[in-house]
Design a protein with these regions (language model features):
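ATP-binding N-terminal substructure of ATP-dependent carboxylate-amine bond-forming enzymes
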Residues: 1-88
Length: 88
């Protein structure tokens, strides 16, 4: 199973009916653990990049239901991929 980081605005502010990012996350979670990266928490230390993150699971797109758990600081170098999503 892959470990994928998602760097994005707070998910509570995302419009689930219009934003394709949540649909992408919903499909990715079948094959990967999704880590939601807190944008303002990224820092660099001893050749490693760290950030606060939490596990994210999209439960329902229609009902805008999601679960965030296991808040912790992680080494971003350990992720298989990081998806950057930013509103224009």
């Amino acid at each position: 199973m892959y470990n994928i980081g998602i760097y994005m605005d707070p998910i509570s502010q995302v419009d689930f009916s219009k934003d394709s990012t949540v649909a992408i996350i919903k499909n990715l979670q079948r094959m990967a653990k999704i880590k939601l990266i807190i944008p303002d928490s990224i820092d660099y230390d001893s050749n490693n990049i760290f950030a606060s993150s939490c596990d994210l699971e999209i439960v329902s797109l229609r009902q805008k239901k999601y679960v965030q758990k296991n808040n912790k600081r992680i080494n971003l170098n350990k992720l298989d991929c990081i998806f950057f999503r930013k509103d224009p």
